[in-house]
Amino acid sequence: MAGDLPSNGLISRNEPIAIVGAGPAGLACAILLARAGRKVVVREWHKTVGSRFHGDYQGLENWSGKRDVLDELNEAGIQTSFSAHPVFQGTAYDYRGKDYPIIGDRPLYYLVQRGGQKDSLEQGLLDQAVSVGVDIRFGERATSIEGPAVSAIGPRSADAIAAGYIFETDQADSNHIVFDNKLAPHGYAYLLVHNGRGTLASCMFSGFKNQAVHVARSVKFFEEKTGLKMNSPRAFGGFGNFRIPNTAMQGGHPLIGEQAGFQDMLAGFGMRYALRSGILAAQSLIDGTDYTRLWRAQLLPLLKIGISNRFLYNAAGDRGARLALRNISHSNASARLHRLYQPSLLTKIIFPLARRQFRRPLHDPSCDHIACQCVWCEHGVGHAD
C-alpha cells in the first residue's frame, strides 16, 4: 500500500514504479528511472501527450541557473530530442508603447513548441521515454496510487492564465513582450514568431473575467507595432498554479511539476522547474535520497525569490516596469535576469510580507494524510483534467 513506502526508502529494482501524468515532469522522471534500469509505467488519461496545449510556442527559460538549461538536462540524462531554438534578443515595450531592445550574451530562453505534434517538447520526451523502455499507457485514468509512484498531474487551480491565438504568418522571426496592465493585468502580452508560425497571448495574473478584452487589445497593439497579419488564427488558452508545498510528498509519493506548485510566480515560467523536479524525484527513488530535502535545496530558493519579485513587480506598477526595461536594455540582459533570480537582502526581507499577501494562491491543496492514495486532493478522488 502507499503508506508502506517511506519517503526516502530504496525501492527494489524489480518493483515497477508508476508515474501518473505524461507531462514534461513525469516523462523526465520516467526517462531517468528507466535509464537506471527500473521498470516504469506511465499512466496518462488523455489519448496522447500535450493535450493541454495547442502547438503554441513557449520559452524554456535560461536565466535562473548559472548553467545553460540544455546542458543541465543533458548532464542529467535528458537528451534534447525536441526542437529548441535559442533566442538571444527581442523587443520589449512599456505601457506607453516605447520599445526597448533586449539582448543577452547567451540564450535568454529556448523557444519550444507545446503539444503532441512532431518536434514538440512533449513528443520529444515521449519518444525518448519509449526508446529507453518506459511503458506508456494512454487513456488510463488513475484514481488511486499503490506501491512506489510519482504524481505529475499538472496544475489544479488557475492563479494565472494565458489566452490568445496561434496562427500562420509571413512575418519574419521575432520575439516581443509588452508590460501594460491594460493588455495583461499584472502580467504581460507576448508575440513569438518562428518559421512562419506564431503565438500571441495575454498572460494575466488578474482580471480573468475580461480576458477577451485583454486579448483583443494585445492583438491590436502588436498589429500596430509590428505590422502583424495573422493567417488562420486559432484561439487557445492555458493556466498555471503557484504555491510552495509543505513537503511535495503525498502518501509517501513525490509530487512534481505544477502539481507541486513548482512555477516562477513572477513570470509564470515553469518548464525548467518541472523538468528539474522530475529529475530530483528520479534521483530520490534511485538512491534513496530524501525528495523533500532535494527540492528544498534546489527549487525552494527560486520559488521564494519569485514570490518576492512578484510582490515588488505588483507594487512598482507600469512605471516601475518602464524603469526596469530601461535598465535592462542598456546592459547584458542575460546577466541582469540571472541577477534578478539570485537571493538578495531585499527579497529576503520582502518574502514574509509577500507570502502573506499571496496566501490564497500559495495555499497547498495536497492532502496531509501520510497514507493518502488519491491522485487529486482538495479533497476528492479522480484524475484532474
Spans of model-derived segments:
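FAD/FMN-dependent oxidoreductases across multiple families
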Residues: P86, Q211-W295
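N-terminal FAD cofactor-binding segment of flavoenzymes
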Residues: G50-D94, A163
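Extreme N-terminal leader/targeting segments of oxidoreductases
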Residues: M1-I17, R35-A36, T143, G198, ...
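C-terminal auxiliary extensions adjacent to catalytic cores
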Residues: A316-D385
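N-terminal Rossmann-fold NAD(P) dinucleotide-binding loop
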Residues: G26-L27
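Glycine-rich FAD pyrophosphate-binding loop
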Residues: A22, A34-D56
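Active-site-proximal substrate-binding core of FAD-dependent oxidoreductases
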Residues: P245, A267, Q283-L323
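Predominantly flavin-linked oxidoreductase catalytic cores and closely associated redox partners
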Residues: A22, H46, G116-R234, G240-T247, ...
